């Protein structure tokens, strides 16, 4: 009996001391984008050029209204969902931007759009939010007011940003991911959670 208790206790100890996802920092200030509007497209292209495995059509890009690098009254930022890309909203987001005479930024959010044997293995909620936060900062550079258009988990990020950044003028959400409803969703937050959900 003592041996069983000892083995069980050891198992519990190993489980509780296993790797665990760190609690993310949800609310942060927007990063400073030092490039001016004439340089910002090149700055984005330079950042994307650091990756040699971006899937075609998944790269971050700005579409200027009338192809002129000039700040518009409104800008749009499209936040794609988990495992998605800006193609998810095509052509609706671009059509709406054209109707509103606005510039639009289509970011590739953190760890997305890459050719990899293990896609999104580096993904964390905090880094995903950080990249959405940068996208909002870019949106402010290219428009006086920013509309966030989003799909699925992109809506999760957009709601978080809007809660902390009143400069968000409006949200346009399609199929928002507000809450995970799977009964075992908590497993991912437990020690060894990443390894368990990958099985």
What are these regions (language model features)?
Residues 108-113, 177:
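Short beta-to-alpha linker loops that shape the active-site pocket of alpha/beta-hydrolase fold enzymes
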Residues 149-158:
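Gly/Ala-rich beta-loop-alpha elbow adjacent to hydrolase catalytic centers
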Residues 114-142, 147:
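Catalytic nucleophile-loop/oxyanion-hole region of alpha/beta-hydrolase
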Residues 29-71:
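N-terminal cap/lid segment of alpha/beta-hydrolase-fold proteins
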Residues 1-39:
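N-terminal membrane-anchoring alpha-helices
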Residues 91, 160-164:
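Active-site signature of alpha/beta-hydrolase-fold catalytic machinery across serine-
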Residues 169-199:
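Hydrolase active-site cap/lid region
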Residues 55-101, 106-109:
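Short, surface-exposed "cap/lid" segments of acyl-processing enzymes
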């Amino acid at each position: 009996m003592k041996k069983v208790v000892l083995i069980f206790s050891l198992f519990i100890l190993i489980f509780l001391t296993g790797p665990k996802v760190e609690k993310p920092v949800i609310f942060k200030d927007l990063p400073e984008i030092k490039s001016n509007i004439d340089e910002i497209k090149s700055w984005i292209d330079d950042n994307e050029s650091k990756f040699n495995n971006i899937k075609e059509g998944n790269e971050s890009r700005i579409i200027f209204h009338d192809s002129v690098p000039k700040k518009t009254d409104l800008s749009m930022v499209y936040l794609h969902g988990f495992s998605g890309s800006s193609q998810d909203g095509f052509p609706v987001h671009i059509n709406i931007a054209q109707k509103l005479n606005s510039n639009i930024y289509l970011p590739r959010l953190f760890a997305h759009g890459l050719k990899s044997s293990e896609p999104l293995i580096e993904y964390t909620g905090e880094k995903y939010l950080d990249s959405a936060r940068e996208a909002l900062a870019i949106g402010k550079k290219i428009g006086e007011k920013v509309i966030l258009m989003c799909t699925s988990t992109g809506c999760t990020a957009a709601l978080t940003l809007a809660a902390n950044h009143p400069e968000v003028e409006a949200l346009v959400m399609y199929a928002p991911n507000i809450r995970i409803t799977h009964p075992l969703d908590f497993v991912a937050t437990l020690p060894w959670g990443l390894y368990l959900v990958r099985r």
